[in-house]
């Protein structure tokens, strides 16, 4: 299946000059969403994954059905102040400022094999932060899966030491 045909491109959103790749049109098509989920599950099974991790919000949309299909758990990575129990945090730089992501301190057990999922790889900052959180808890990142990779933003450089797959790529 050619998933690219199900991606909507929204010009000049969220700001002028940006061509936003919208995956909601994959999600609202049961066949396309199921296909994407199944492909990531196949990838994960080859890596003997124990738990799936995904950053909010679209990492949840990808990771939860994958975890459910595999009969394993899902651990969310969220913005600061959104998780109710004790958390670990990771602060990282954005173009104009910083951002903080958190994860429950007991979400990952040392030695667990982790798949990180998200909708899209752009600059790599969010996924790099998720990796740091998982590894701080003693997890082993055995794979990272995306629906889309924007190759022209070169986010892969931040995570080049990890096994990464994407179902769709855009060169420009």
Swiss-Prot record:
Subcellular location, principal: cytoplasm
Family matches, as Pfam families: Pribosyltran (PF00156)
Catalysed conversion reaction: AMP + diphosphate = 5-phospho-alpha-D-ribose 1-diphosphate + adenine
Signal peptide: none
GO biological process: adenine salvage; AMP salvage; purine ribonucleoside salvage
GO cellular component terms listed in the entry, alphabetical order: cytoplasm
Cellular location(s): Cytoplasm
Record carries keyword Transferase: yes
This protein's UniProt keywords: Cytoplasm, Glycosyltransferase, Purine salvage, Transferase
SUPFAM superfamilies: PRTase-like
Top-level taxon of origin: Bacteria
Pathway: Purine metabolism; AMP biosynthesis via salvage pathway; AMP from adenine: step 1/1
Function: Catalyzes a salvage reaction resulting in the formation of AMP, that is energically less costly than de novo synthesis.
Family recorded in the similarity comment: Belongs to the purine/pyrimidine phosphoribosyltransferase family.
Subunit description: Homodimer.
Protein name, per record: Adenine phosphoribosyltransferase
